[in-house]
Swiss-Prot record:
This is Adenosylcobinamide-GDP ribazoletransferase. GO terms for biological process: cobalamin biosynthetic process. GO terms for molecular function: adenosylcobinamide-GDP ribazoletransferase activity; cobalamin 5'-phosphate synthase activity. Pfam families: CobS.
């Protein structure tokens, strides 16, 4: 029980800015087991967003609430995944060789492509969430972050790391397939309860497809994955899920 709590708190500490005032074991096995809780962390984030939405929907227009929710997400996650998307776009669109691309991705400064990617990411999230709320799919506020993290887990099934050292290496190739498939089944069952089978399966297939295409792009550009590409995967997974759901 103590190790389970350790791994859960480790995921909260690693993926959010929620203060965890506790010394935790941070071995590879802790992260491997802790992957089970990544969608749970996403559920906590999405759940808080949903509660904010419910608390404000009678006082503010939906479009204003969505802006506040996006701001809240950026604050509670430290913009971790958005930063990964920006770094990935800066590197991949630089049209340089592998070594130079990785150097660009490690640079803390944001470039033109990263800026454009963030603007598009935020605009799409805003418009998609706003449109889905108006359509009666406010539950997407909770589901999108969970599906995004699920896509990260699937990407981590690959053992191809682009760097010898990096924060992403503790996840890449270290995920348990049974755990990932078990978590995915639970998430899909819950999503089906709220959205129906068709509105769950088709968007999820789209997310898996985008995840695989990103994987192929990563192999082509840098011969593997990094922590930044995992963050990019989350953002692309969320947007793909929301976009296809809106089309249903």
């Amino acid at each position: 029980m103590k190790s389970i709590l350790n791994d859960f708190l480790l995921m909260i500490q690693f993926f959010t800015r929620i203060p965890v005032n506790k010394n935790l074991q941070c071995e590879k096995e802790n992260f491997k087991r802790g992957a089970f809780f990544l969608p749970v962390v996403a559920f906590i984030i999405g759940g808080m967003e949903f509660l904010i939405y419910l608390g404000l929907k009678n006082f503010l227009p939906a479009n204003v609430i969505i802006v506040l929710l996006i701001l809240f997400t950026a604050m509670i996650t430290g913009g971790l995944h958005m930063d990964g998307l920006a770094d990935t776009c800066d590197g991949f669109f630089s049209l340089r060789d592998k070594e130079r691309i990785i150097e660009i991705m490690k640079d803390s400064r944001i470039g033109s492509y990263g800026t454009i990617a963030l603007i598009i990411d935020l605009l799409l999230k805003y418009q998609l969430l706003y449109s889905l709320v108006l359509k009666g799919y406010s539950i997407a506020i909770v589901l999108a972050p969970i599906i995004g993290r699920i896509s990260i887990l699937f990407l981590c099934l690959s053992k191809r790391t682009a760097k010898k050292n990096g924060s992403g290496n503790i996840f890449i190739g270290n995920m348990s397939k049974p755990i990932i498939f078990f978590i995915t089944t639970i998430v899909l069952v819950l999503s089906t309860y709220f959205l129906g089978l068709r509105a769950t399966i088709i968007p999820f297939i789209g997310v898996l497809l985008i995840t695989y295409l990103l994987y192929l792009l990563c192999l082509n550009k840098i011969n593997g994955l990094t922590g930044d590409t995992l963050g990019a995967c989350n953002e692309l997974g969320e947007i793909t899920f929301l976009l296809i759901l809106l089309m249903m």
